[in-house]
């Protein structure tokens, strides 16, 4: 099934998840000022599938039409098809709005591909059946999933099981014949206030206590599920798409997830009680890290194309595009675009063709994504450098051009090479919304830390990602050393 936007809006309105905002429970997230922007963008995502046939596929695993984001690639050609579909989606977002429904659709699809070689082997047939059933349910209903994985930072000097309350991090309080009761919290559940379903993933690297090792899927309106949303970064009152051209379309909400003695049925659980199996899930058999980092590269490729275009347009508009120092920075941005494009092509060409799925190359996907943690903030830095003070003296809003006397002054003094005043203001409003608005700053912070601390991730590339290949590289040095003469003693 492929829904239309109005069906999604009706669904989330009727489900009415418990969302706290500014001290109150939100009555209708579809109309609330803090959430109506992303709700409309998600609705457009669904409508986009009806406008562009290439985003729809016949899903042979379920036996009906679905979004291309549910495609389980079984060949390099199908992996390419998936990548091309996702690029089309993120090009429509200009690389923003990274927690679109397709993101978790891909996760759910990957889980289903490993129902036998991972979930059945590690947890038994029942859990493997749960994986398949949840995937089929997701395809047939075209649900919008959020996820939560980051545990509260209560005291990082001690494992959560030694905290004053061991259920600050989400854990199993007790089992019943029908399921388990879970309690605790998780941070930064992006899109949660307007999502229909939730995946919770365990964080067991900080504590291997089995009660924390649970991975499940439940509706966001399940009794005891609560979300505390951050302050919205929507346009200020009285302003809109002219003044905030990016955040008026691609503002994403983030929330804290609270599970207050929530009942999770056994048939919604796919991972339980074996913390040692998380390594196989993240790094070995399933290699979820490969998939979500590959998806990040797709998002960033679309964003960098947009940022490079923005920088070039600004440089040409103010007549600095022939300065060598500016050309160097523009060239740097274009190199970043090509690097991400090459990484996507390379990850396909060197893909791992497994029995039930073809996976993008892990080394390339993870390395490029980790590099982008520093590269994207650098792109913003280049935009700030190129624009200089030009991003500051911009009129307050569209109404300035509706005042005849003021309009004449603006048209005379704000025009620049190749752009009239209104075009120039539009251009620099885009720039400011990317580099200076609350939404823009949030995106930059998200780009830096959404995969974790960049220092740890870069170090991890050495001690974990390339663990199997380090000997391949050091062997080359040893070959040269062996060819060198030794002293005659």
What would you call each of these model-derived segments?
Residues 61-196, 203-216, 221, 226:
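Glycine-rich flavin
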Residues 36, 40, 136-139, 181, ...:
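Generic structural signal for well-ordered, non-transmembrane alpha-helical segments
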Residues 152-296, 463-488:
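FAD-binding core of flavoproteins
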Residues 150, 316, 342-349, 377-384, ...:
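Charged/polar positions within long, soluble alpha-helices
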Residues 324-331, 359-367:
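Short, charged, amphipathic alpha-helical segments
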Residues 292-353:
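Extended amphipathic alpha-helical segments enriched in small hydrophobics
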Residues 1-48:
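N-terminal-proximal low-complexity accessory segments that begin disordered
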Residues 363-489:
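Alpha-helix capping/hinge segments and adjacent helical runs
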């Amino acid at each position: 099934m492929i829904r239309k936007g109005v069906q999604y809006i009706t669904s989330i309105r009727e489900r009415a998840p418990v969302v706290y905002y500014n001290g109150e429970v939100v009555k209708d997230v579809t109309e609330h000022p803090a959430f109506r922007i992303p709700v409309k963008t998600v609705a457009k995502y669904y409508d986009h599938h009806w406008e562009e046939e290439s985003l729809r596929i016949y899903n042979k695993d379920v036996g009906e039409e679905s979004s291309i984001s549910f495609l389980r690639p079984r060949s390099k050609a199908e992996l390419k098809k998936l990548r091309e579909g996702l690029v089309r989606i993120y090009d429509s977002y200009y690389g923003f709005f990274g927690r679109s429904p397709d993101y978790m659709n891909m996760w759910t699809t990957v889980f289903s591909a490993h129902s036998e070689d991972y979930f059945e082997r590690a947890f038994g047939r029942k859990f493997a059946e749960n994986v398949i059933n949840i995937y089929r349910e997701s395809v047939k209903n075209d649900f919008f999933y959020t996820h939560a994985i980051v545990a509260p930072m209560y005291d990082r000097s001690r494992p959560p099981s030694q905290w004053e309350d061991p259920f600050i991090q989400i854990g199993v309080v007790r089992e019943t014949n029908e399921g388990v009761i879970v309690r605790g919290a998780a941070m930064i559940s992006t899109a949660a206030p307007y999502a229909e379903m939730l995946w919770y993933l365990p964080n067991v690297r900080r504590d291997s206590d089995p009660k924390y090792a649970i991975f499940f899927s439940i509706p966001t309106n399940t009794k005891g599920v609560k979300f505390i949303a951050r302050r919205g970064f929507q346009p200020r009152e009285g302003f809109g798409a002219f003044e905030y051209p990016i955040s008026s379309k691609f503002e994403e909400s983030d929330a804290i997830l609270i599970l207050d003695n929530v009942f999770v049925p056994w048939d919604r659980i796919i991972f339980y009680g074996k913390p040692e199996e998380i390594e196989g899930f993240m790094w070995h058999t399933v290699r979820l890290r490969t998939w979500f980092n590959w998806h990040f590269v797709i998002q960033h490729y679309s964003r960098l194309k947009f940022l490079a275009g923005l920088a070039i347009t600004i440089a040409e508009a103010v007549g600095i595009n022939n300065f060598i120092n500016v050309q160097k920075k523009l060239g740097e941005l274009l190199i970043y675009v090509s690097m991400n494009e090459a990484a996507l092509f390379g990850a396909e060409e060197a893909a791992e063709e497994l029995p039930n799925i073809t996976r993008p190359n892990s080394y390339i996907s993870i390395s490029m994504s980790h590099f982008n943690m520093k590269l994207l903030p650098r792109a913003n830095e280049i935009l700030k450098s190129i624009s200089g003070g030009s991003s500051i003296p911009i009129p307050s809003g569209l109404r300035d051009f509706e005042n005849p006397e003021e309009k004449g002054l603006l048209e005379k003094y704000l025009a620049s090479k190749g752009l009239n005043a209104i075009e120039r203001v539009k251009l620099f409003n885009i720039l400011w919304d990317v580099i200076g608005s609350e939404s823009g700053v949030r995106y930059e912070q998200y780009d830096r830390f959404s995969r974790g601390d960049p220092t740890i991730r870069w170090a991890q590339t050495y001690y974990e990602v390339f663990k199997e290949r380090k000997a391949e590289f050091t062997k080359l040095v040893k070959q040269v050393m062996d060819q060198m003469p030794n002293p005659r003693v």
